[in-house]
Amino acid sequence: MAATVAFSGVLRRAGWRLLQLRCLPVPRCRPALAPRAFRASAMQLRSLDQQKDQPPPSSSQQQSEAQGAEEPNPEALRSPPRYTDQGGEEEEDYESEEQLQHRILTAALEFVPTHGWTAEAIAEGAQSLGLSSAAASMFGDDGSELILHFVTQCNARLTHVLEEEQKLVQLGQAEKKKTDKFLRDAVETRLRMLIPYIQHWPRAFSILMLPHNIPPSLNLLTSMVDDMWHYAGDQSTDFNWYTRRAVLAGIYNTTELVMMQDSSPDFEDTWRFLENRISDAMNMGHTAKQVKSTGEALVQGLMGAAVTLKNLTGLNQRR
């Protein structure tokens, strides 16, 4: 009888153990590690395996390691520069080729008054950054990249100025200018950026008129006059939108030509010419005949300017 009771107790305990095992929660399937986490886990496992294969450290090694742990190296604690990409993942910071070229061209502008829009100016700019002068070989020999970079920077500076003026008006800290005065000041502000380089600007202008530079230079010009009209408050959606920008582009280019030949103090003749052209544009009607004549005059003026500048700079001479 006692044996039967004992055997029954064993069965009950075994059944309870089985029931406990069946009631244990089933672990959920863990998602696959992301590539970055997977690489980190693999590195940790590899490190553990290497530690297992190595002999145990001696007491002197343990003491030196303990001292090193007490006095961490500041350089080791400094994390490398990182940035966040479009996917939200952090990567180590690096400088792309475009960023390097941007830095070199920006530094080269300081040497344009001395060397002009040349490879020598680019080489000097590279050396000022601690780079080899051979970095100038990243660019062409005609200075096109340097000139286009300068125009792009000037347009960005102008946009910033116009944005700041708009903010002051919105905050009530400045009065809103009339359209003619706003455009005149905007064009003058942009042209004054050429003054430090005015001696070499005729050649830059002629280089921008070369066939392979016309698309980017025209894009920069149209973008600039569009910003001017935008901050002037233009909200036209009809044909006047194109007319106003074409007229302003013509005014800018013709005033630029006058400026390159102006010897008056502080380019007074240039600003007087600009004011008269802006006034004429504001008084001009919007008939089809006037629009056509304005467009034809603009094209003829630009073509004449290209021929004139080629003659001045000697680009039309055979070498």
Swiss-Prot record:
Alphabetical keyword list: Acetylation, Lipid-binding, Mitochondrion, Transit peptide, Ubiquinone biosynthesis, Ubl conjugation
GO MF term list: isoprenoid binding; lipid binding; protein homodimerization activity
Bias (Acidic residues) ranges: 87-98
Entry-linked InterPro entries: COQ9_C (IPR013718), COQ9_HTH (IPR048674), Ubiq_biosynth_COQ9 (IPR012762)
Residues with PTM N6-acetyllysine: K176
Subcellular location: Mitochondrion
Keyword Acetylation included in the entry's annotation: yes
Primary residence: mitochondrion
Interval spanned by the transit peptide: 1-45
Residues the record lists as binding a 1,2-diacylglycero-3-phosphoethanolamine: R245
PTM text: In response to mitochondrial stress, the precursor protein is ubiquitinated by the SIFI complex in the cytoplasm before mitochondrial import, leading to its degradation. Within the SIFI complex, UBR4 initiates ubiquitin chain that are further elongated or branched by KCMF1.
Domain observations: Structurally similar to the bacterial FadR protein (fatty acid metabolism regulator protein).
Family that this chain belongs to: Belongs to the COQ9 family.
Quaternary context: Homodimer. Heterodimer; two heterodimers of COQ7:COQ9 come together on the same side of the lipid pseudo-bilayer and form a curved tetramer with a hydrophobic surface suitable for membrane interaction. These two tetramers assemble into a soluble octamer with a pseudo-bilayer of lipids captured within. Interacts with COQ7; this interaction allows ubiquinone (CoQ) isoprene intermediates presentation to COQ7 and facilitates the COQ7-mediated hydroxylase step.
Function of the protein: Membrane-associated protein that warps the membrane surface to access and bind aromatic isoprenes with high specificity, including ubiquinone (CoQ) isoprene intermediates and presents them directly to COQ7, therefore facilitating the COQ7-mediated hydroxylase step. Participates in the biosynthesis of coenzyme Q, also named ubiquinone, an essential lipid-soluble electron transporter for aerobic cellular respiration.
Name of the protein in question: Ubiquinone biosynthesis protein COQ9, mitochondrial
Organism field: Bos taurus
Phylogenetic classification of the source organism: Eukaryota, Metazoa, Chordata, Craniata, Vertebrata
